[in-house]
Amino acid sequence: MRQRPKEQDKIERRHNFNPVEENLTPEQVKEEASRCLSCKNPRCVKGCPVNIHIPDFIKALKEDKLDEAGEIIRQTSMLPSVCGRVCPQERQCEGQCVLGIKGESIAIGALERYVGDNTAAKPVEITPTGKKVAIIGSGCAGITAASDLRKAGHDVTIFEALHQFGGVLRYGIPPFRLPRTVLDREIETLKAMGVKFEKNVVVGKSITLKELKDDGFDAIFICSGAGLPKMMNIAGENLNGVFSANEFLTRVNLMHANEESSATPLRVGKSVAVIGGGNVAMDAARTAVRVGFEKVYIVYRRTEAELPARLEEIRHAKEEGVIFQFLHAPCEILGKDGYVSGMKFEIMELGEPDESGRRKPVGTGRYATLDVDTVIVALGTGPNPIIQKSAKTEGLDFETDKKGYFTVNEETRETSIPTIFAGGDVAPVGTSNAINAMGAGKKAAKAINEYLESLK
């Protein structure tokens, strides 16, 4: 039987930001590891974007070799404690596990998290190459690339636009899913390796790509994320009480705007509608519960079966009292005296599948309203063009797609301008999540290292 971690009481956790799940116990780890079949052709490894040697680290756990398990994971993943908590394992490694065909897959994520939390990265002997790499952004892609490039001996500097490091791991994912102590430990590991960190540096404003090159950086990896929110473009979006999920989560996670002592306090109303069905929508809704909204709705234009969020996130949201309104498409945000007073929706039904493979919502001509005083829009984000615009004034004209994302070689992550690479949410390939960003960081680091090696 699959082992499951103990969870914080669903009523208590509505009122705090403490982690919802505990680690598995050592006994549970041993029991879960014993279920692994040690397949000769492990599908789970193919399902992992960074190709962690999953059967090998689980075998080490079977043999009570915890430190060895940590070494195996860290051969390919810098962030086991992070990935064990936030990666969509049910759609990746665990989704490929043969045991899941007729029963329950191995709890790979929980095992990885346990190993990450209970082992430390060993010191690495660095042989300096004299080459310099600039990494723009300190999220998953940047941290991963920095680790690999530093191990190869290169002088690595990470430039972060905000005042704390971690990117979306810091400002986007709430601490009840990813404790800040976990993220801080990973950052400190990089610093101990000799990676340099510069905060409050907006590349394209504070410094340009050309200036970085002039400062002696031999290669640049752009992984600054996608920070521009996608809005609904409906009437009422300019009313007070309308937030993008990006703003709402950043204000709570990074600026602590929910606390009384905050210099920029968050206005908490009675009821909020969160528009969207992904993990960000779940994070926003569950955060809204914790900051004090009495009623929290998630409004989604399809049915529960089409929700793209992790199953665990959906379950936790329901347990915490979030109300789901399915087959509702926003039409208008209603207002009174400049503030949100409600929302109008069209009732939908499902038609034929669209390009995503999900059945397309079709309007019925019937309408409904919700009494809410706050709206949080969680419909995704797009790239900020500041780097491209700044570069263009210096004669660096990047190729981008129609949405503004960098066009890159999928294997090397190199942009249309030689020696400049891009990955993560600024040049997404596949679903946008932590582990895919890490995969992009590894590809970029490999290509950058090969280029720098060729200069010798």
Where are these regions (language model features)?
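Ferredoxin-type iron-sulfur electron-transfer modules in oxidoreductases and energy-metabolism complexes
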Residues: 13-32, 53-85, 102-125, 252-253
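Iron-sulfur cluster-binding cysteine motifs and their immediate structural context
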Residues: 38-63, 82-115, 157, 161-164, ...
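Feature captures the FAD/FMN-dependent oxidoreductase FAD-binding
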Residues: 68, 127-128, 132-136, 184-234, ...
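Glycine-rich dinucleotide-binding loop and its adjacent helix/turn
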Residues: 112-127, 185-205, 229-291, 400-411
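N-terminal Rossmann-like FAD-binding beta1-loop-alpha1 element of flavoenzymes
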Residues: 132-157, 281-289
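Rossmann-like dinucleotide-binding cores of NAD(P)H-dependent redox enzymes
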Residues: 158, 162-193, 197, 285-332
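FAD-site-proximal beta/loop scaffold in flavoenzymes
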Residues: 238-269, 353-430
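A conserved FAD-binding loop/helix module that cradles the flavin
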Residues: 426-455
